A protein has these predicted regions:
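Residue-level signature for tetratricopeptide repeat
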Residues: 43, 137-139
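Extended ligand-binding groove/face enriched in aromatic
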Residues: 40-73, 93
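Conserved, well-structured interaction surfaces
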Residues: 1-51, 77-84, 94, 99-101, ...
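Acidic interhelical loop/turn segments
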Residues: 19, 23-28, 99-130
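Hydrophobic-face positions in mid-chain alpha helices that act as interaction patches
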Residues: 126-127, 150-277
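Short coil/turn linking the two alpha-helices of tandem helical-hairpin repeats
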Residues: 48-55, 105, 142-145
């Protein structure tokens, strides 16, 4: 709650200052404004999901008091808005971001290989046009407006700039990196492995899998085919002498010493995917 609103305050400072400027003042004015508006909407949407009741709740008192939607950088206390009001504000802000970020149609290539230079290079590491559209699809879906969700998901799909990971890349496509195939937008983070190891693997409870987690995945199909995710996304960690099942999809092999590397040497960018094409 606190860190989210702290981040929102930084974004409000950026947006409030940009509103007194124009494209003639900054070369990438539209990208700056689009990213800031989009991120502000995303964080408010996450706060709504975490701290408010669902839009279909019958608790009208709780629905009337969801979260504050803060848009000013000042000491004024922002009153709470209703769940419906938050959805309206998030959607409106994401549509504004979409309009500002139209340049990404040209800036984002269909084939991403890494090593892009400059602010307009690695757009997959910024909140971008397709991030706005994918988030709109997710917001509309959660709101229950499936027709609108389909419209925005279709925009991302028809851009032909994102595809599902192949079965041969399942063990590496997002280990410590944003996927060059599936990621619509992500954040650069060179500490994914150490963060995951410290917060989810070494500490009992936080990253533990349920004893029946394998039942989610099909062991073998009628023709001998199997679910590749089970073999590629899970491993074992020795915690104080006791072997425990862990998820290695994000962090990589826990015994791989190269996982400790925090320097970028080309290829997929070190970081975390914020939304991928199957997550819209």
């Amino acid at each position: 709650w606190k860190t989210s609103y702290l981040a929102i305050s930084y974004l409000n400072n950026i947006i409030n200052n940009l509103e007194s400027k124009s494209e003639k003042d900054f070369r990438h004015y539209n990208l700056y404004m689009g990213e800031a508006l989009g991120l502000r909407a995303v964080i408010h949407f996450d706060l709504l999901r975490f701290f408010a009741v669902h839009v279909t709740s019958t608790d009208e008192v709780a629905k009337a008091r969801a979260i504050p939607y803060v848009t000013e950088y000042d000491f004024k206390v922002t009153p709470y808005s209703s769940v419906e009001e938050i959805y309206s504000k998030v959607i409106a802000e994401l549509k504004r971001a979409e309009a500002y970020l139209s340049e990404d149609e040209v800036l984002m290539p269909a084939e991403r290989v890494g090593n892009e230079n400059g602010f307009t290079g690695a757009r997959v590491l910024h909140f971008n046009l397709y991030g706005a559209q994918a988030t709109l699809a997710r917001v509309y879906w959660m709101k229950g407006d499936l027709d609108s969700a389909r419209i925005y998901a279709d925009k991302v799909i028809r851009s032909n700039k994102f595809r599902f990971a192949s079965k041969t890349s399942l063990n590496t496509f997002m280990q410590k990196t944003v996927s060059m195939e599936e990621t619509i937008w992500g954040l650069y983070n060179a500490e994914v492995y150490s963060d995951w190891l410290t917060q989810h693997v070494r500490r009992q409870g936080l990253g533990d899998l349920t004893t029946d987690f394998k039942s989610i995945y099909a062991y073998e199909g009628p023709t001998g085919k199997k679910d590749y995710r089970l073999d590629n996304w899970f491993g074992t960690y020795n915690r104080s002498g006791t072997p425990v099942d862990i998820l290695v999809k994000v962090m990589g092999n826990v015994s791989d010493t190269t996982s400790l590397t925090t320097s970028y040497n080309g290829g997929p960018y070190l970081g975390t995917s914020m939304i991928r094409i199957p997550e819209m």
